[in-house]
Regions:
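Membrane-water interface regions at transmembrane-helix termini and the short interhelical loops
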Residues: 1-2, 71-78
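Non-catalytic accessory segments adjacent to catalytic cores
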Residues: 20-24
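Catalytic tyrosine of NAD(P)H-dependent dehydrogenase/reductases that use a Tyr as the general acid/base
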Residues: 14, 75, 147
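Alpha-helical transmembrane segments
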Residues: 25-46, 59, 63-64, 68-72, ...
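RNA/tRNA-interacting regions in translation and RNA-turnover enzymes
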Residues: 77, 81-85
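Membrane-interfacial loop-to-helix junctions in multi-pass inner-membrane proteins
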Residues: 2-17
Length: 187
């Protein structure tokens, strides 16, 4: 027999789950040689070309944890109760789809001074699928709402955005494109 719990998961269990996702992502990046200890500032500040600094793998893991946990919780706070996060998610995914496409082509990446990431163009399909799912969600979320996103949707979307920017090595782009998430989290 299933019992109903009105409280859901505690915040401690949610953070532990997010740390598990961070560990899985780090192991995947490490195993496939995608780890890049170079944090690039050139997309955030295009005036200073080749502005970056190196960090150790342990600090990179801590940085990844901050990006993934911070992003997923900021998106969750932006969501509120009625799917308010869907509009910003569509905008951020569209922006990331363009940047991901550009990082997947060596000529564009070199011309725009971006890190070239082999086969990152495949993630464009994933980001466009998130856009399509979000538009479909909006259709059923208008009054009277038939579908609610909840923590499951908003935490997942925030984590997925973080993982995409980590894979394309543009971690500092997320605060720029998702500025609304930061403002909402700080309010």
């Amino acid at each position: 027999k299933l019992t109903k719990h009105k409280n859901g998961l505690s915040s401690k269990k949610k953070i532990i789950g997010q740390l598990i996702i961070t560990v899985i992502t780090f192991v995947f990046i490490w195993k496939y040689g995608l780890i890049n200890p170079r944090i690039d500032f050139s997309i955030v500040n295009p005036i200073l070309k080749n502005s970056y600094f190196y960090i150790t793998p342990v600090l990179f893991f801590v940085f990844m944890a901050v990006v993934i946990i911070g992003s997923s919780n900021a998106v969750n706070l932006t969501d509120g109760l009625d799917g308010l996060v869907t509009g910003p998610i569509i905008i951020v995914c569209f922006t990331l789809a363009i940047i991901t496409y550009l990082t997947g082509h060596i000529e564009y990446a070199k011309y725009l001074n971006l890190n070239y990431v082999v086969d990152s163009g495949e993630m464009v399909v994933f980001l466009v699928a998130i856009i399509g799912a979000s538009i479909g969600f909006l259709w059923y979320n208008f009054y009277p709402a038939q579908v609610f996103m909840g923590d499951t949707g908003s935490l997942t979307l925030g984590g997925l955005l973080a993982i995409v920017v980590i894979f394309i090595k543009q971690e500092l782009l997320l605060p720029v494109t998702g500025f609304i998430f930061i403002v909402e989290a700080l309010s």
